């Protein structure tokens, strides 16, 4: 029988509640599928049970202490093996979530997870953000991305997906302030503003800084540009 994770106290300590039995069962099944399929798809270098639950599952949820996502239409950009999108769907089943990634193997994996966990109102798409954003312009209430790209790059890739007054949530590491400094005021060009910054101390899985933006106006037609051009002009040093 598969070993079941039992250190649910880390969720209570960091989120203020213990997951329901249904959520626990789905997370345990998700972990089992992740480890099994990782042998084929090379999804994550982190496979130890304790580490996956803390560094992937819990980390995917910490931002929810700062904003509500209930009943929101969400896009997870560069979702990889489903962080944070699958985790959010398990905890907040009433959300409507689209997962996108340019790696088709990861999309295949996500479809396995969605089917086995019987998740509803969630879709995995093999797509590039800069191309899909032109098609799905101003469609989402929330766009979210976890450790995908340098700040000015992900801002440009994500902003067109959002409705006006929609939220962009970026789950970052300890260098977020440096990325803001080097972003060349791209947020002003994109008509989006930083409204909140959540700083999380290192409690065993690294210092985290989560950034919250709000879209003020429609995205100028220029953006997003081709990916190569975005990266070439990035403020990353």
Swiss-Prot record:
One of its GO terms (molecular function) is rRNA (guanine-N7-)-methyltransferase activity. Keywords: Cytoplasm, Methyltransferase, rRNA processing, S-adenosyl-L-methionine, Transferase. Pfam families: GidB. InterPro entries: rRNA_ssu_MeTfrase_G, SAM-dependent_MTases_sf. It is found in: Cytoplasm. One of its GO terms (cellular component) is cytosol. The keyword S-adenosyl-L-methionine applies. Its main location: cytoplasm. Its EC number is 2.1.1.-. S-adenosyl-L-methionine binds at residues 78, 83, 129-130, 146. Belongs to the methyltransferase superfamily. RNA methyltransferase RsmG family. Specifically methylates the N7 position of a guanine in 16S rRNA. This is Ribosomal RNA small subunit methyltransferase G.
């Amino acid at each position: 029988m598969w070993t079941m994770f039992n250190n649910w106290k880390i969720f209570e300590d960091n989120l203020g509640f213990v997951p329901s039995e249904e959520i626990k069962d789905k997370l345990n099944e998700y972990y089992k599928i992740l480890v099994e399929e990782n042998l084929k798809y090379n999804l994550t270098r982190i496979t130890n049970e304790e580490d996956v639950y803390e560094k992937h599952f819990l980390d995917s949820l910490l931002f929810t202490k700062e904003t509500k996502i209930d009943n929101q239409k969400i896009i997870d950009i560069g979702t990889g093996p489903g962080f944070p999108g699958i985790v959010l769907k398990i905890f907040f089943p009433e959300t409507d979530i689209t997962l996108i990634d340019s790696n088709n193997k990861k999309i295949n994996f996500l479809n396995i997870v969605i089917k086995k966990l019987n998740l509803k109102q969630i879709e995995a798409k093999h797509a590039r953000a800069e191309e899909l954003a032109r098609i799905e312009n101003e469609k989402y209430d929330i766009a979210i991305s976890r450790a995908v790209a340098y700040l000015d790059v992900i801002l440009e890739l994500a902003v067109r997906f959002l409705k006006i007054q929609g939220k962009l949530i970026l789950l970052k590491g300890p260098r977020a302030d440096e990325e803001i400094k080097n972003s060349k005021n791209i947020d002003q060009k994109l008509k989006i503003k930083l409204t909140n910054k959540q700083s999380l101390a290192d409690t065993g899985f690294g210092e985290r800084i989560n950034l919250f933006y709000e879209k003020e106006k429609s995205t100028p037609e220029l953006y997003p540009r081709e990916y190569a051009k975005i990266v070439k002009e990035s403020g990353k040093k």
